[in-house]
């Protein structure tokens, strides 16, 4: 049976489930036992990529494949999904095991992003793709509107590399500081070092690639603040 808290939360996300157990599963992290949300996360990843690709294809009729791909990547990346989760106060609804709860898992980007994908899959399974589209796309509307039409911002690693190359400086060096977690809940910390500038930043993410992007983003922020 769904709790009154979870029942109220359906109003916040804009969808009332026919089968509330799907929502409960979407909110349950693997640390809290089964049935957890990993399978839903897998499906939701594909569903959200389809919905965003479709929306961009329709909104940007003259954009080439590269621009569409970069825009989709920007909208569905971990930090973007985590931001949506925070807007919807999803972290407060998550069902976590004692360890994750104690370590603040309800605030971690990777867990929040995975939960958003799981909720999207739950809506898709409970209803259909058309309903899922109607419910989910408004979550992305602010980010969609903010993207420069046909020319979405490049990812942080690319932007940092191009900035350094324009000044004929050495490329950044990324190094793994540590990785933790089991195969399904990996967490990485990576450093980004800019030799000539004597600048070193760190980033975190659920994959090494995401951690490097986060470190590059922090480096860009430092460079911008020093202008």
UniProtKB/Swiss-Prot annotation:
What the record says about family reads: Belongs to the ribonuclease III family.
Ranges for the region named Disordered are: 203-227
Q: Which GO terms describe its cellular component?
A: cytoplasm
Question: What are the names of the required cofactors?
Answer: Mg(2+)
What positions constitute the catalytic site? Answer: 45, 117
Per its record, the protein catalyses: Endonucleolytic cleavage to 5'-phosphomonoester
Where would I find the RNase III domain in this sequence? 6-128
What the entry lists under PANTHER family is as follows:
RIBONUCLEASE 3, RIBONUCLEASE III
Query: Which is an annotated GO molecular function term of this record?
Result: metal ion binding
Question: Which InterPro entries does the UniProt entry name for this protein?
Answer: dsRBD_dom, RNase_III, RNase_III_dom, RNase_III_sf
Q: Cite a single Pfam family from the UniProt record.
A: dsrm
Keyword rRNA-binding present in the record's keywords: the answer is yes
The top of its lineage is:
Bacteria, Pseudomonadati, Pseudomonadota, Gammaproteobacteria, Lysobacterales
Source species of the chain: Xylella fastidiosa (strain 9a5c)
Q: Write out the biased-composition intervals (Basic and acidic residues).
A: 203-212
Where does this chain mainly localize? cytoplasm
- Compartments, record wording: Cytoplasm
| Protein's name in the database | Ribonuclease 3
This enzyme's EC code(s): 3.1.26.3
Please give the function described in this protein's UniProt entry: Digests double-stranded RNA. Involved in the processing of primary rRNA transcript to yield the immediate precursors to the large and small rRNAs (23S and 16S). Processes some mRNAs, and tRNAs when they are encoded in the rRNA operon. Processes pre-crRNA and tracrRNA of type II CRISPR loci if present in the organism.
Keyword field contains Cytoplasm: yes
Ranges for domain DRBM come to: 155-225
Output the NCBIfam families linked to this UniProt entry: RNaseIII (TIGR02191)
PROSITE patterns for this protein: DS_RBD (PS50137), RNASE_3_1 (PS00517), RNASE_3_2 (PS50142)
């Amino acid at each position: 049976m769904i709790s009154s808290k979870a029942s109220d939360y359906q109003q916040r996300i804009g969808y009332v489930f026919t089968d509330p157990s799907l929502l409960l599963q979407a909110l349950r992290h693997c640390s809290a036992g089964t049935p957890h949300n990993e399978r839903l996360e897998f499906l939701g990843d594909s569903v959200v990529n389809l919905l965003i690709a479709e929306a961009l294809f329709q909104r940007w009729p003259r954009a080439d494949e590269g621009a569409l791909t970069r825009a989709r990547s920007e909208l569905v990346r971990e930090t973007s999904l985590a931001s949506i989760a925070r807007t919807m106060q999803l972290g407060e609804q998550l069902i976590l095991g004692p360890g994750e709860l104690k370590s603040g898992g309800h605030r971690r980007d990777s867990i929040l992003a995975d939960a958003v994908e799981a909720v999207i899959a739950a809506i898709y399974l409970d209803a259909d793709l058309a309903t899922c589209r109607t419910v989910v796309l408004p979550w992305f509307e602010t980010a969609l509107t903010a993207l420069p039409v046909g020319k979405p911002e490049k990812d942080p690693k690319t932007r940092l590399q191009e900035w350094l190359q324009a000044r004929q400086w050495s490329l950044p060096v990324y190094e793994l500081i540590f990785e933790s977690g089991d195969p399904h809940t990996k967490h990485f910390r990576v450093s980004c070092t800019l030799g000539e500038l004597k600048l070193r930043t760190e980033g975190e993410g659920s994959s090494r690639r995401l951690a490097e992007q986060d470190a590059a983003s922090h480096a860009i922020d430092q460079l911008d603040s020093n202008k």
